[in-house]
């Protein structure tokens, strides 16, 4: 049993990139689907596909690598808010990720979005993870 599904999601992506895998399969949930959509919109992954099976479904993610250096597009995935220590932030108090080069994924009352989107909509929330 996984006690922190978001940490498991990030770890599966991190481990697949360290092993230079092109594809990673992750058990699906609505929150993970939204995080995957954000990663695709921001250009951190090549493509993704949701597959339904008899249980909860799968998310298949095609990871993105630099063509010349073969380095992954995602340099770091770190969990910020965790079950034992939740981290919340107001819209004007979001910390910049990698001096503005990365993104933070935030769960707000208006849905899951990046820190920049939350700041523009003037809504705070739980900071799930930082990606750069």
Enumerate the language-model features and the residues they cover.
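Core subunits and conserved enzymes of cellular information-processing
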Residues: 1-132
């Amino acid at each position: 049993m996984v006690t922190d599904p978001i940490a498991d999601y990030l770890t599966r992506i991190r481990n697949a990139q360290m092993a230079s895998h092109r594809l990673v399969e992750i058990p699906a949930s609505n929150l993970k689907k939204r995080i995957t959509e954000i990663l695709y919109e921001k250009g951190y992954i090549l493509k993704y596909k949701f597959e339904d099976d008899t249980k909860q479904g799968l998310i298949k993610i095609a990871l993105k690598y630099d063509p010349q250096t073969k380095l992954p597009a995602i340099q770091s995935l770190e969990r910020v808010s965790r079950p034992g220590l939740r981290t919340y932030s107001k819209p004007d108090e979001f910390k910049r990720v990698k001096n503005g080069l990365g993104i933070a994924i935030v769960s707000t009352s208006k849905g899951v979005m990046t820190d920049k989107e939350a700041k523009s909509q003037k809504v705070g929330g739980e900071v799930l993870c930082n990606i750069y």
